[in-house]
Amino acid sequence: MNNTLLLIILNFVGKIFSFVREMIFSFTYGTGDITDAFNTSTTAATLIFSVITYALSKTYIPTYNEVVKNGDEKSGDHFTNRLLDFMLFLTTLMMILGLVFAPFIVKLFAAGYSGEKLKIASLFMRAVILTIYPNVYAAIFSAYLQIKGDFLTPALPLVIMNILLGLTIMVSKGNVVIMAVGIFLAYFLQYVMFPRATKKAGFRREKISFGLDPNVKKLIILSLPTTFTMAAVYISTIVDQSFASIVAPNGGVSIVNYALKILRIVSSTFIIPFQITAYPIIGKLVANGDIKGMKDLTGQSLVKIMTLFIPSIIGLMVLSEPIITFVYYRGEFTYQDMIATSQVLFYYSLYLIGPALADLLYLSFFSHQNTRVPTIIAFIQLGINIILDFVLSKAYGLVGLALATTFSQFAAVLMALIAYYKYFGKLNYPYILKNIGKIILAGGVMGAFAKFFFAIRPSNLWLLVTIALAGLIYVGLVYILKVDEFDQIIAAFKKKKKKLE
């Protein structure tokens, strides 16, 4: 729990810097062409990276554990070296293709782009594509360091990147070349801490060899379905962005991205830390054949996530307009932009329940080296999302895209729960539902208070007061209602506080 708490704090700090960066961006560029180009290009390049890095992060840990179990830690390091060699070869090919075909890739993500807007987006994308080496390096060694118990180093890149991007936006003043150079430096230098950390963990680089190691070959075969899983998720994102660029050609992509960036603060702060710390433990439980322990940990992690996550969703929905006003409404970001973004944020908020549940359930499948089930679910979800995008965007515009994503994600959760029951048996549903019921009750009271209290004196300062008081009310209610996992969260905070003292 202490590692989870540390990750929550670090992710929150990173997202504060992300918030500041977005405030600077919205003030400087609003929802204009440069903002659209930046959002589309960085999203496109990042999603391409993530298809690979996600597959590596989900298949490296179980493969490494198996190699060490059959040999020793030296064997695990040898396997890691051979994997890094193979990925250097693969990413070189990807980088060349990305640099050559950048305009075509941008058009896939935003069919409505043309002329100068397409040129700017292509320039920005090439800047990010050049950083593919450190991205893949970090994907492998983030998992390696987590196995070794270092959860701090993999959490630092977000802070470094957002500081550098914020500085870039401030000094660029509309100069797209300065923006491109700054984007490259931000994405490249965010991983500056990794070489020292891996050396400290005991890793030593071996001489480069491009022979295909049997364990690397096994990981590649294992990761193919996982790659398709992530590809399906990102094809969905491509479709959403393309529809956004058509439904609202002037600023539609930026409006959707501004809303999603706020949601990602909640996701990366409250979901990802629990998954990062739970995954190596689940992997070890599976390796030891402890299926009951795996299911118990999954249920406990789910309740812990929901304890922090449900009130965040309720707060985002109730205070969507004042939150968008506080973060973005200044400079080139207009009143119409604020209204449109707050509406999209409201309907996207419920979507986050999907990744919180589905991704946690998938960890058990990945630990069993079963990547087929998550892949099938992801592609069914993709089909549902595309159909709903087409239907709902015609009727409701950008809000329709948010609804389509939300409904398709709920379908994925239902399929994941059915598959989990089929392969591993029941989770402790009475325990889970009892606690989630209490959390929803406490969150509902908190949301009602926040809505009416903010209405007394609407302002940015009053918003902060409202959030603080609503948070205290929620904590008090959860404590009174005796949500099971809440005691562990409080104990971890107290333990961390004593260490700091």
Give the positions of each predicted feature.
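Transmembrane helical elements of multi-pass membrane transporters/channels
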Residues: 2-26, 186, 190, 194-198, ...
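Helix-loop junctions and terminal segments of transmembrane helices
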Residues: 54-70, 271-302, 362
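Alpha-helical transmembrane segments of multi-pass membrane transport and lipid-handling proteins
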Residues: 84-108, 299-331, 339-356, 386-387, ...
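Alpha-helical transmembrane segments of multi-pass membrane proteins
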Residues: 113-138, 333-361
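Membrane-interface junctions at transmembrane-helix termini in multi-pass inner-membrane proteins
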Residues: 133-156, 350-380, 391, 395
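Membrane-interface helix-loop junctions in multi-pass transport and translocation proteins
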Residues: 152, 160-192, 372, 380-418, ...
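Interhelical loop/hinge segments that connect adjacent transmembrane helices in multipass membrane
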Residues: 195-233, 292, 422-440, 491
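Membrane-proximal transmembrane or re-entrant/amphipathic helices at the cytosolic face
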Residues: 452-501
